[in-house]
């Protein structure tokens, strides 16, 4: 990662300074971007599972963050038994404070360090652990319905009206927080062949959604409303001043639309999980792709604003190719990272590698943004364009605030969720996903107000006569040099015998008249010094000076 950060300079345009003056925040931000893992949006937790268990299967292990008084329902939907079999089904509900505690249970079962007959509550230290057992459950080939599973203690504390609805409830949580639910199925006849299709559901006060995902669902709903308000506000401004809309304002409209679409799709996915308990993988992948496009376009928007596109420069030239290439690179890796996280989980190797690459690309974005912004502000200061300079000064202050907020937040998340031995702050986990969307929404509203359509919109537009770009200045110089060469040839005329005719005052007047008629006034300032420096003109000037000096003596 360090080598990747050091190689960033080779990918950018050459400058005398790699960083703008007085930019310690940029160095700190780049270091944190290289060393801190990228923020990973967690896949929402399910609320309904359908599992197949046979005579060779081990215990079923389920993990979820649940509210207090969440009902856990367990039932056998279908079964197949080759002969008469008596089942003993035992389930254990364990509450634990640390989210990363007991994360290796599946590995222990695979290595046979834990057996099916193990007392899991004893292994899990018995604290906040409840065990329930249903014995002598008959199953044979003639059975039509598998015996229902229940917890007598829970049935006794329910009233009669809710008793029928609660027959499948096998456990109920006593606290808000992380829980592990383990189901162990044993038979007396170990040689019997059998197959069970088990259904498990966890329904809390807000439906199937987990306690850690419920605040995130509310956040996406609020942000969707916020982006709708952004869109209405921007459309209103654009409709009032549609004749003066700048090119940069179309980019802002596209970012607002994609942000609204992204939040709407994520909210619908979380709402679907809350209602059904199941996640629609296709909808989740679509949401991740929309998010990747929106994040890419948002970064490109900040870069082209920093470069002064449409404000200081009419076009970006070859720099635009680098910006688009960097954006496409980010889009590809962001899309792959999102899809692989949905399919393979957050710990998949491809996800980890993509996170590292995205961190490096983000550091390049930060580098590019600050260098371009410093160059744009320097140009505006030299041109003494106070209106545009004030605009970019406010934008710079917004980016500095975003960098400071990112540094503080990355330090907090690293301490709380990544290096902590006991990850107990489950109520704040949604902030790890929501912060970056909220921070960009603040940057976007600042950009909207700074570049909003208005009656004075053209104050911020590029003016060819005032805001000439560097490329046009170079083209002007080349054209001027070509013109002066022609003027030098015009200064000495040949006669028929091949000898040069010396310049006289009449020739000088003719040359001056030709210059005034054929060369624009903006070019004479560059062309005239070359004309004056010719030998003939030096002689003419000296003769005129002598005449004027002699006339003064006579007077």
Curated annotation (Swiss-Prot):
InterPro entries: GOST_TM, GPR107/GPR108-like, TMEM87A/B_GOLD
Keyword vocabulary terms for this entry: Glycoprotein, Golgi apparatus, Membrane, Phosphoprotein, Signal, Transmembrane, Transmembrane helix
Signal peptide bounds: 1-42
Cell compartment(s), UniProt: Golgi apparatus membrane
Glycosylation sites recorded in the entry for this protein: 68, 197, 272
Chief location: Golgi
Protein name (database record): Transmembrane protein 87B
Gene label: TMEM87B
